[in-house]
Amino acid sequence: PMKEVSIRGQGSLAYPGLRTQGNLETLSGPNDATRGLTSLADTFEHVIEELLDEQQVIQPSKENKDADLYSSRVMLSSQVPLEPPLLFLLEEYKNYLDAANMSMRVRRHSDPARRGELSVCDSTSEWVTAAEKKTAVDMSGATVTVLEKVPVPKGQLKQYFYETKCSSKGYAKEGCRGIDKRYWNSQCRTTQSYVRALTMDNKKRVGWRFIRIDTSC
């Protein structure tokens, strides 16, 4: 969804434009607010669908032959990305809208002290360079070297990975939040998913492979 324009010889990131249909400040009454939230959620669903469709129709060429190798958590750039991946932000905001829409229906029946929402496990997210990762495990279970730089027509770009892991300051050691410790044992653990990255195996063969990175807690 987020494409690195540097692949085509530019030096910045390209983000598709986003337009929402109204905002909460222009709404009046609970019914209008509910319709507004639904409209915003539908808008972001439409944007996500357009982004996915756009990614699927990208055709490799001599100038952007690697454009189809991007993941929402992998970025090729000449500098550290300043923001999380676009699709990641869209999913986070849509989840917020869904939660807000649900809380509006139950708010009048809820105790004010219980209206706040907390995650079961605390997590942190940040961009990590290939130099920091160094190695990773691919889909076959083999350990491969993650290459720091990717060659492009007009130079080289660095590989960045947006990783999410359990926070060391949260409930990782004390158990999951909301679990009754008198009856249950729980633990927050970092889980991984596969993303595609440029790597080198133990036989010095360089290629794009799916590797595991930390993606949730």
From Swiss-Prot:
Gene Ontology biological-process entries: cell surface receptor protein tyrosine kinase signaling pathway; modulation of chemical synaptic transmission; negative regulation of neuron apoptotic process; nerve development; nerve growth factor signaling pathway; neuron projection morphogenesis
Cellular component annotations (GO), alphabetically ordered: axon; dendrite; extracellular space; synaptic vesicle
Residues modified by glycosylation: 101
Record localization: Secreted
Propeptide part(s) removed at maturation, as residue ranges: 1-108
Database matches in SMART domains: NGF
One Pfam short name: NGF
Annotated disulfide bonds: 121-188, 166-217
GO molecular function: growth factor activity; nerve growth factor receptor binding
Keywords: Cleavage on pair of basic residues, Disulfide bond, Glycoprotein, Growth factor, Secreted
Domain of life of the source: Eukaryota
InterPro entries: Brain-der_neurotrophic_factor (IPR020430), Cystine-knot_cytokine (IPR029034), Nerve_growth_factor-like (IPR020408), Nerve_growth_factor-rel (IPR002072), Nerve_growth_factor_CS (IPR019846)
Family according to the record: Belongs to the NGF-beta family.
Main function: Promotes the survival of neuronal populations that are all located either in the central nervous system or directly connected to it.
Protein name stated in the entry: Neurotrophic factor BDNF precursor form
